[in-house]
Amino acid sequence: MHSLRPTVPASTPPLDLLLTGADILTAEPGAPLIRAGAIGIAAGRIAFIGAEVPPGVTAARTLDLTGRLITPGYINIHLHSALTMVRGVAADLGFAPSYTRGIPNAMDLSAEEATSLARLGALEAMLSGSTLIGEHFVHADAALPALAELGLRVHTSLRLHDVDFAAVANGAWNYEAEIGFSLLEANLELYENWHGKEGGRVAIQFAAHAADTCSPAFLRRIAMEAKARGARVNTHLAQSKTEIKRVRQETGKTPVQVFDEAGLLDDHLLCGHCLYIDETDLPRFAASGAHVVHIPKCNAASGRMAPVHKLKDAGMNLTLATDTQHGDMIELLRWALATGRVQEGGVSDRWQPRDVFAMATINGAKALGLEHELGSLAPGKQADLVVLDCRRAHLTPATDPLGNLVHTAQGRDVEMVVVDGRIVVEDGHATLVDEQAIIADAQRVAQGLWKRARAQA
């Protein structure tokens, strides 16, 4: 555990930013809440954190944050930001847009349209406290510069598959090697051009879409390329009964078995949903070190819940993500807590606010191999943090700030977001981009997409 004692000597040069007066949840294992504490930031990192400011410390900018709560930035590890285009509609259709006729889907998007919508979704996520997003979708290469401009961390990939998605919504499942080859080549180019750029805020992953949309041969190729670069692989695993049925028909195996045989089932695999993990696969799944990406709101909206207690009891690392159509990780804390308790049929010590808070912070960092840099607030770590304004009726009294955060806070309570020591949200608004221009452009694009989709239905 990192020490939280202020140890900065008086001779230290001025800090870039000094935050005082706020309650602080560090997400460090076993660390207590710091009441009315202080955080010093210099050169993008946390210089000190504690109950008081060390003597002699000065800063280029000092902010009195009395009445606020500071937490680590939220690691939103699985996100398709462009799917803001089906907000308010797709959740009531029962299945993902790519599999559904009559609504806009990925294959309908131009690079410009995907960029506009992805920028909106990423903006929403950042305004709600996400400091890192795991973004994978079509035209990710075109959208990446616009997402990086927001100032948050972007771990991204093109959506990799060799099924012909243009035919999937009509019930045809055709695998074409050329589709997969073209997408993978584009993602390799994206990796070469962008991985590690923007001061390390950008990382390129390999997003193998799913076991039913990637042939076993294509999954093996993805595994080879990702392993050669030490890259993370983001996927949807056991997300639907249709997936389970199709994979069984095509291979005679389960999705977990298919990923294992392809060489993907290891500690670099980020597994979204995990709704239908076969009981016989659980020991193999847990032993692999793969990470579970829990997506409680989207799952519950379709009437389903992941077996999080079985996965946790098996020793798996559980992370959290918004997935599609909304980007509020604070709201998601509540969904994760509540749906987990519905599954248990009550309240127990094994599923408490501290558990879902860890999923949104340090567990996400662990899944990315970045737990020594991100996911908690400690001296030496990168300065990614969120400030919530708790001087509000629904956050009063602040008897237990963690309990309030999980049970009653909202993304709109976020007052400030700091990424790599830089303020990217202040007074609830983005500092580096024109919010209203992003919103207006996305509205324009979405209206055009819906008009086209309805004409084709």
Question: Model-flagged regions — what are they?
Answer:
Residues 73-77, 133-135, 154-156, 204-208, ...:
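Hydrophobic faces of well-ordered beta-strands that scaffold small-molecule active sites
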Residues 134-137, 205-221, 300-302, 367-369:
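Active-site glycine- and acidic-residue-rich loops that bind
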Residues 261-268, 309-392, 408-409:
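His/Asp/Glu-enriched, well-ordered alpha-helical/loop segment
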